[in-house]
Amino acid sequence: MPALILPLIEAAVHWPVRGALLGLDLGTKTIGVAASDPDRKLATGVETIARKAFTADAARLLALAAERTACGFVLGLPLNMDGSEGPRAQSTRAFARNLSRLTELPIGLWDERLSTAAVERELIANDVSRAKRAKVIDEHAAIFILQGALDRLAALRRAE
């Protein structure tokens, strides 16, 4: 049965209480990957995958999920500033649908508006060279996306 693809808050219901999550920032040329600890408090960078064919990309993501015994994915959804979905969001949803056919791990979609811009500002503020930024931007964006999702889930748990 294909994995569920839901907004983050709805997907969280289908994840066990503990277990790592993988955060993904889909770019046209790369996929930034981050992972949480099993308690879902901290996101750390894993790697930047140079995109090839979907099957190769998916195989690498599923291998990373297995290595970390991840129980789900958090996929950054690039919404427009007005909240609408443009071509990049549609492409991300298509990627999620294709990935869902290969795994049963639920996929949570999380608004990633301005994540890359925020990460780029932070890297510039830390004097990271343009060449180095280009190599790490997607992985850092994945960390930003996943940490935002983890913080939101933690806030919801505290409010219960």
Swiss-Prot record:
Q: Name one Pfam family in it.
A: RuvX
**Protein name (database record):** Putative pre-16S rRNA nuclease
Which family would the database say this protein is a member of?
A: Belongs to the YqgF nuclease family.
- Which SUPFAM superfamilies does the record match to this protein? Ribonuclease H-like
NCBIfam families (alphabetical): RNAse_H_YqgF (TIGR00250)
State the EC number(s). Answer: 3.1.-.-
Q: Which InterPro entries match?
A: RNaseH-like_sf, YqgF, YqgF/RNaseH-like_dom, YqgF/RNaseH-like_dom_sf
Q: Where does the UniProt entry say this protein principally localizes?
A: cytoplasm
The free-text function statement in the UniProt record for this protein reads:
Could be a nuclease involved in processing of the 5'-end of pre-16S rRNA.
Question: Which HAMAP family does this one have?
Answer: Nuclease_YqgF (MF_00651)
| Compartments in which it is found | Cytoplasm
Report any one BP term from Gene Ontology: rRNA 5'-end processing
Q: Which UniProt keywords apply?
A: Cytoplasm, Hydrolase, Nuclease, Ribosome biogenesis
Q: What would you give as a GO molecular function for this chain, any one?
A: nuclease activity
Q: Which GO terms describe its cellular component?
A: cytosol
